[in-house]
UniProtKB/Swiss-Prot annotation:
Keywords: GTP-binding, Hydrolase, Lyase, Magnesium, Manganese, Metal-binding, Multifunctional enzyme, Nucleotide-binding, Riboflavin biosynthesis, Zinc. It comes from Endomicrobium trichonymphae. Disulfide bonds: none annotated. One of its GO terms (biological process) is riboflavin biosynthetic process. The keyword Manganese applies. It catalyses: D-ribulose 5-phosphate = (2S)-2-hydroxy-3-oxobutyl phosphate + formate + H(+); GTP + 4 H2O = 2,5-diamino-6-hydroxy-4-(5-phosphoribosylamino)-pyrimidine + formate + 2 phosphate + 3 H(+). Pfam families: DHBP_synthase, GTP_cyclohydro2. The gene is ribBA. Residues 205-403 are annotated as: GTP cyclohydrolase II. HAMAP family: RibA, RibB, RibBA. Binds 2 divalent metal cations per subunit. Magnesium or manganese. Binds 1 zinc ion per subunit. GTP binds at residues 255-259, 276, 298-300, 320, 355, 360. The record marks 129, 167 as: Essential for DHBP synthase activity. The keyword Signal does not apply. This is Riboflavin biosynthesis protein RibBA.
Length: 403
């Protein structure tokens, strides 16, 4: 294994291609589980035995809905209550040429037959010893689970989109955490990757934004073009408000603005979002060319309902970061790949970015955009939002001089 904790997605895909396993973890900064993953096409008694002997978790087969439908393999329960939203189906055994179904040989046969187009639904006994998992359409871009990571990885490796996964446990039966997984990887010469990096890889290498329509947009700030984009995975709509000719222009003035219904529409004084949007539109309207992106990522990515729940916690004394964490969210869940692809579709590669947020700069640059200059977009604090802005400066690193 290389002398670093996390391998590249490219290295992991190479391993999958030659039939090796990789370890996939939820998040490097959290105490979450790691799963062994390999391609279902590479299922063998040796692979199954390794998983049962060394990983010790439940062996499952993530796969696409279409194949499960062909085999008439239904969900295990009609209304799952499992908190991570993992979609288990009924367990199965392949009936032909197997015995009890539990041996490494029998389970490897069942895995291979699940993806064999000649195998029919009547060839499988229910229940059994292999647990198919229904992958969410869109893979890790739709759900950041091991199920989706497995299907994405094997697809990238050129195999049929189905994998084998098994949680890794310690000798004493406890779940293996990050330090344990690093030792496990070194012992067995395996690469470790994160689901987050797989998400980033797909967003960098695949197109998932499509232009739907563009229209003239006369406003109090000037005459613009409004370009509507659709996220092909989530079906969310995002807007680009464009001034002048921006295609192939250098250092275009850009604001990437996340939606804030309370601030942008109802002029809430809890935040500076509405004022920032108006200031950005005014600046772009006065420029020769520019763009304001309006991204559907309410509440820094947690959605309107959760944002309002966070407001309730703030009314009880928490700040915006503490409230997010109390609800189980990171302080900022926004995905800048959406904005980067919208700018790319508009033919823009270098920008002057209106922002106070260093995370936004890093996020956009990670997708290949050149940020020539940062243009501050600071709004004077009010009594209602002073604590909010102070928290953004002290806990989120925002570059604010007036707070």
């Amino acid at each position: 294994m290389k002398n670093k904790v996390f391998a590249s997605i490219g290295d992991a895909v190479k391993d999958i291609k030659v039939g090796r396993m990789v370890i996939v973890v939820d998040d490097p900064g959290r105490e979450n589980e790691g799963d062994l993953i390999c391609a279902a096409e590479k299922a063998s008694p040796e692979v199954i035995n390794f998983m049962t002997k060394y990983a010790r978790g439940l062996i499952c087969v993530p796969m696409k809905h279409e194949r499960l439908k062909e085999l008439e393999i239904e969900n295990m329960v009609e209304k799952p209550t499992e908190k991570k939203g993992c979609s288990f189906t009924v367990s199965v055994d392949y009936k032909i040429g197997t015995t009890t179904g539990i041996s490494a040989y029998d389970r490897s046969v069942t895995v291979r037959k699940l993806i064999d187009k000649t195998a029919k639904h009547e060839d499988f006994a229910r229940p059994g010893h292999i647990f198919p998992l229904r992958c969410k359409e869109g893979g890790v871009l739709a759900r950041t689970g091991h199920t989706e990571a497995a299907v994405d990885l094997v697809r990238l490796a050129g195999f049929y989109p189905a994998g084998i996964i098994c949680e890794i446990m310690n000798n004493d039966g406890t779940m293996a955490r990050m330090s344990d997984l690093i030792k496990f990887a070194k012992k067995h010469d395996l690469h470790i990757i994160t689901i987050g990096e797989l998400v980033n890889y797909r967003r960098r290498t695949e197109k998932f934004i499509s232009e739907i329509v563009n229209v003239d947009l006369p406003t109090r700030y000037g005459d613009f073009k409004l370009v509507l984009f659709e996220d092909l995975i989530t079906k969310d709509s995002h807007i680009a408000v464009v001034k002048g000719v921006v295609k192939n222009r250098q250092n275009v003035l850009v604001r990437v603005h996340s939606s804030c219904e309370t601030g942008d529409i109802f002029h809430s004084l809890r935040c500076d979002c509405g004022d920032q949007l108006e200031t950005a539109l005014k600046a772009v309207g006065e420029a020769e060319q520019g763009v304001v992106l309006y991204i559907h990522q309410e509440g820094r990515g947690i959605g309107l309902a959760n944002k309002l729940k966070a407001y309730r916690l703030q009314e009880k004394g928490m700040d915006t970061v503490e409230a997010n964490k109390a609800l189980g969210f990171d302080p900022d869940l926004r995905d800048y790949g959406i904005g980067a692809q919208m700018l790319s579709e508009l033919g823009i590669k270098s920008i002057n970015l209106m922002t106070n947020n260093p995370g936004k700069i890093n996020g956009l640059e990670s997708y290949g955009l050149k940020i020539t200059k940062r243009v501050p977009l600071e709004i004077s604090p009010s009594k209602s939002n002073e604590k909010y802005l102070k928290t953004k400066k002290e806990k989120m690193g925002h570059m604010l001089k007036k707070v």
